[in-house]
Amino acid sequence: AIAATMVMGAFASTSTIAAGNNGTARFYGTIEDSPCSIVPDDHKLEVDMGDIGSGILKNNGTSTPKAFQIHLQDCVFDTQTTMTTTFTGNASSTNSGNYYTIYNTDTGAAFNNVSLAIGDAQGTSYKSGAGIEQKIVNDTATNKGKAKQTLDFKAWLVGAADAPDLGNFEANTTFQITYL
């Protein structure tokens, strides 16, 4: 019995330790000359416009505007009082180029008779390259801009006289924020 216990004890003490896992972690970003940082998830915004019936877009109709935001953090303002956000993208040939081209996600072709409008929170649309100005929200105690700011926008589809193409769509723009 003593020998059996010694043998079992030997097996227990020589049990192997499972090998660990190894990997790497990459940390990246950009340091910019700016009073604020864009919240990381807002660098690549995705705005789901939903399913839009073609009937609302006929005869120069518009879809229901979809609100979206860009969030800023770690803001330190000196004398700045406004932020201007400029969206740029391909101007649509529909509606005299006042809006953005939308593309069929299956074929890559531009949609006919419909385009994307981007505007301020009140629903005023802005052409590609035109700045949308918003006031910096101040902290009442310091009378300086708050460390967190939210930029509010809306996007909607604008039809033409004729019926729009049908299918899944996307429009891609870039945006830049300047501080004055």
What are these regions (language model features)?
Residues A1-A18:
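Gram-negative bacterial Sec-dependent N-terminal signal peptides
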Residues T14-L180:
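Mature extracellular/passenger domains of Gram-negative fimbrial/pilin and adhesin proteins
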